[in-house]
């Protein structure tokens, strides 16, 4: 029988687990429930995907958004894993085919929205098959204290209880205060769970706050975006009107930008999201409807054009930068107008006819105001931004991180800020105590020859991805390509030693990359 380490290497291409991952995997395999709080980019999905491939039955992953399911399943299929998703983006015929195949044992991992668990057809399927594990992703959605409360998450427990044999349950989230963790544990009725918080820190992320009047924000944004060159980025706005205006502003300057918000036609949203994932668009301008669970690893910057409603939302959205561990920037533009806009939405939610009792809505509004207060403190503090956030999530941190605007740029003018920010990005890759030596190496500077090789590998990846009709990062991540440049493998055995290269991907793409490397650097013999 395979063990977790062999699955990790053969399927996902990693030599070792990251901190906290192996303990979670082994607890789930032993049948113990898990509650794990891990920052975006820390590898939550590995924690349930590895045991899913080792457990005898099917794993059901409850996920809140179609985009997350599509990303995760696409990446799994590229790695050779039998996975599928079931949601309303499929036609009725596609849903029926997927369920029939699931009954026939085609899949080891199935992603569903929480509402799907209540549907008779899916319930009948789950009664017939062995469900070994139920994974609750974005588990903070179960809590009214959480920033993304979804009432349908409260019914996950009923589904678990209805199964003939109770599966092991794993709950995962990137951001959860102590109160939210209490709600997750209680509402899912986890059985003596193994609880772990691997730490919220993302050392490769640089944080910055800038106060800017609404009239100043367009210029600030353009300056920031133009300095990023061709890097992929996300710009978050608080309203759909602001999204449309900001996307048009960037487009008017020749920047490949697209908009994403709930008022757009579903087909337009899908096209714009795919354009971003497939690198046809450089920048996505979006409300927070975009990105929960988006797994695009090479987002190099996230700019919040408006202050978010709370630190949970901010850290989750900012955390979509640098998921591959390479240096990336998270910048917040804020003004007093932002606070008034958020309060308007809080009041609107209070007035909404959503069937909730008045006292429940009043309590939700009070909690929202409390979270907004901390968000405002973060935006205006002169102390270390990283420490402020980590302390908010209950984690100790040094007085100064050395990689945020408050630490690095106090009393400096804007030009000095940008110069030192560039230097800080380089230091983050080389010196971060959380990044391994290997990951630090692939984030460093390259020689002119290596830059040409990297460009050739990017071009090859783009061609191969187009043939497979998948986003380029699903072939190999930027970090994996940079390690290829550093290591210059010339044999399949050497290629399989590259982080992120599993057996299926090596079989599918290995010879093409080996030929490209040999063409550029020649034989070492």
Task: Write out the residue ranges for each language-model feature.
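Accessory DNA-binding and partner-docking regions appended to nucleic-acid-acting proteins
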Residues: 1-4, 340-341, 346-361, 367-373, ...
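Helicase motor core with emphasis on the C-terminal RecA-like subdomain
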Residues: 2-11, 15-19, 23-45, 52-55, ...
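Short alpha-helical "packing" element that flanks the helix-turn-helix/winged-helix DNA-binding module
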Residues: 21-24, 375, 481
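Short alpha-helical segment immediately N-terminal to, or the first helix within
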Residues: 27, 304, 378, 483-484
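Conserved catalytic helix of short-chain dehydrogenase/reductases
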Residues: 67
């Amino acid at each position: 029988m395979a063990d977790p380490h062999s699955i990790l290497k053969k399927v996902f291409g990693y030599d070792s687990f990251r901190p906290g991952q192996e303990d979670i995997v082994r607890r789930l395999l032993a049948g113990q429930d898990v509650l794990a709080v891990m920052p975006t980019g820390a590898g939550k999905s590995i924690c349930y995907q590895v045991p899913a491939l080792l457990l005898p039955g099917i794993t059901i992953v409850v996920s809140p958004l179609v985009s997350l399911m599509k990303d995760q399943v696409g990446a799994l299929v590229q790695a050779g894993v039998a996975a599928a998703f079931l949601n309303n983006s499929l036609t009725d015929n596609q849903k029926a085919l997927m369920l029939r195949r699931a009954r026939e044992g085609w899949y080891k991992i199935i992603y569903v929205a929480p509402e799907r668990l209540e549907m008779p057809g899916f319930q009948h399927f789950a009664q017939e098959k062995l469900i070994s594990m139920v994974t609750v992703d974005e588990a903070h959605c179960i809590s009214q204290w959480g920033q993304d409360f979804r009432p349908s998450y409260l019914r996950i427990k009923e589904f678990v209880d209805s199964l003939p044999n109770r599966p092991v349950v794993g709950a995962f989230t990137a951001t959860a205060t102590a109160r939210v963790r209490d709600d997750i544990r209680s509402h899912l009725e986890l059985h003596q769970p193994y609880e772990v918080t691997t730490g919220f820190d993302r050392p490769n992320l640089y944080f910055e706050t800038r106060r800017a009047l609404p009239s100043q924000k367009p210029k600030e944004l353009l300056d920031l975006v133009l300095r990023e060159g061709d890097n992929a980025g996300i710009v978050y706005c608080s309203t759909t009107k602001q999204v449309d205006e900001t996307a048009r502003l960037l487009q008017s300057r020749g920047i490949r930008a697209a908009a994403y918000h709930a008022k757009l036609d579903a087909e337009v949203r899908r096209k714009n999201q795919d354009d971003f994932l497939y690198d046809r668009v450089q920048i996505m301008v979006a409300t927070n409807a975009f990105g929960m669970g988006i797994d695009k690893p090479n987002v190099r910057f996230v700019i919040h054009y408006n202050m978010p409603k709370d630190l949970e939302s901010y850290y989750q959205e900012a955390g979509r930068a640098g998921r591959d561990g390479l240096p990336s920037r998270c910048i917040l533009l804020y003004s007093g107008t932002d606070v008034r806009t958020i309060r308007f939405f809080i009041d609107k939610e209070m007035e909404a006819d959503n069937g909730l009792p008045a006292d429940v809505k009043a309590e939700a509004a009070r909690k929202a105001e409390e979270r907004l207060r901390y968000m405002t403190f973060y935006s205006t503090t002169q102390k270390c931004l990283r420490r402020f956030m980590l302390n908010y999530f209950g984690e100790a941190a040094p007085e100064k991180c050395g990689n945020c605007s408050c630490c690095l740029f106090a009393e400096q003018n804007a030009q000095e800020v940008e110069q030192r920010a560039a230097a800080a990005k380089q230091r983050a890759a080389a010196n971060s105590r959380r990044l391994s030596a290997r990951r630090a190496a692939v984030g460093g500077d390259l020689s002119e020859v290596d830059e040409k090789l990297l460009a050739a590998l990017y071009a090859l990846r783009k061609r191969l991805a187009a043939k497979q009709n998948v986003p380029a990062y699903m072939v190999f991540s930027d970090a994996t390509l940079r390690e290829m440049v550093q290591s210059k493998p010339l044999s399949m055995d050497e290629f399989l030693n590259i982080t992120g290269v599993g057996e299926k991907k090596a079989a599918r793409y290995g010879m093409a990359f080996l030929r490209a490397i040999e063409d550029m650097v020649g034989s070492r013999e």
